[in-house]
Amino acid sequence: MTRISLTRYLVEEQRKHNTIQPELRLLIEVVARACKAISNAVSKGALAGVLGSAGTGNVQGETQQKLDVIANEVLLDANEWGGHLAAMASEEMESFYEIPNRYPKGEYLLMFDPLDGSSNIDVNVSIGTIFSVLHMPKPGQTVTEADFLQPGTHQVAAGYAVYGPQTTLVLTVGNGVHMFTLDREAGSFVLTQSNVTIPEDTKEFAINMSNMRHWAPPVRKYIDECLAGDEGPRGKNFNMRWVASMVADVHRILTRGGIFMYPWDKREPEKPGKLRLMYEANPMAMLVEQAGGAATNGEQRILDVQPEKLHQRVSVILGSKNEVERVTRYHQEAQAKA
């Protein structure tokens, strides 16, 4: 069996579909190399003294872990000099990072959550890196925040790396979803699954049940029906899964189906949700849709949401298509009665 590396896959996709420009191919390869470096740091853990808090906070008001800071720096350092990017934006930084004048500038914008699920770092549970690529609207001009504020439909590539028992890179460039496993001996990502498909139906849901009392009625209705099992209106038993790492939960859904929900709750009613639209929801929504699933905020398709600011938050409901459509319908019915 011929082993297909990430580089070979990207070159062959470029030849077949002519949708991957050489600059985009090289950008994806650089991001993949950065993910290998992050995977190496994660795997060393306490041996390298990288566990625990960094003693700082990010723009989200969250305490940064040492590996949050390390992963962010790895991605910045790896991508700033290649000539493929005009700027980068990170969940960990208040403003975007424009490529310094000492380096050539390209036509793409890169956004990333350098280490998703960082509350799991010290307990050795799967975490990951999420990334999204956009075209720079006006290449060659000074970058502004407005250049990043494009709906998710404008993404030219999206993906994540999950650092678990294996390190797996999951990628879409608009032609389906493909998984690459890191061969540590060879030092390369190898294609291990092509054209990933999410089943339309499922018996698994992922949500933080401890917040149930804070949810809106449509979400409670859906979960109540799941919990009622084969004696309830759904006529089947459901299992719950919750890792508290979006990368890990979405990876499970891409692998075997399910629905992931991080909904609005009434503790912070002025915020539309918890997850970040640009760094988490949009890239994951693109991946899920490319795999035949669906992703909404309860009211509209996530990829259609027009961003208004870099660190905008959003409710997220994604996964198996029929389940996502059911939850969305419950929201629409509740709005119609209001």
Swiss-Prot record:
Pathway recorded for this protein: Carbohydrate biosynthesis; gluconeogenesis
Keyword annotations for this protein, in alphabetical order, are: Carbohydrate metabolism, Cytoplasm, Hydrolase, Magnesium, Metal-binding
Domain of life, source organism: Bacteria
User: Which Pfam families would you find in this protein's record?
Assistant: FBPase, FBPase_C
Q: Give residues annotated as binding Mg(2+) 1.
A: 91, 113, 115
Cofactor(s) needed, names only, are: Mg(2+)
Which InterPro entries does this entry report, sorted A to Z? Answer: FBPase_C_dom (IPR044015), FBPase_class-1 (IPR000146), FBPase_N (IPR033391), FBPtase (IPR028343)
What the entry lists under Gene3D superfamilies is as follows:
3.40.190.80, Fructose-1,6-Bisphosphatase, subunit A, domain 1
Catalysed reaction per UniProt? beta-D-fructose 1,6-bisphosphate + H2O = beta-D-fructose 6-phosphate + phosphate
Its subcellular locations are:
Cytoplasm
Annotated residues that bind substrate are located at 116-119, 208, 274
Task: Cite a GO CC annotation.
Answer: cytosol
Q: Which CDD domains match?
A: FBPase (cd00354)
Q: Name one GO molecular function term.
A: magnesium ion binding
Instruction: Report the top EC class in one word.
Output: hydrolase
Q: What is its main location?
A: cytoplasm
Could you say which residues bind Mg(2+) 2 here? 113, 116, 280
The record's EC number reads: 3.1.3.11
Task: Provide the family line.
Answer: Belongs to the FBPase class 1 family.
Xref: NCBIfam families:
PRK09293.1-1, PRK09293.1-3, PRK09293.1-4
Q: How does it assemble?
A: Homotetramer.
Q: What is this protein called?
A: Fructose-1,6-bisphosphatase class 1 1
From which source organism is this entry?
Cupriavidus taiwanensis (strain DSM 17343 / BCRC 17206 / CCUG 44338 / CIP 107171 / LMG 19424 / R1) (Ralstonia taiwanensis (strain LMG 19424))
From which lineage does this chain's organism come? Bacteria, Pseudomonadati, Pseudomonadota, Betaproteobacteria, Burkholderiales
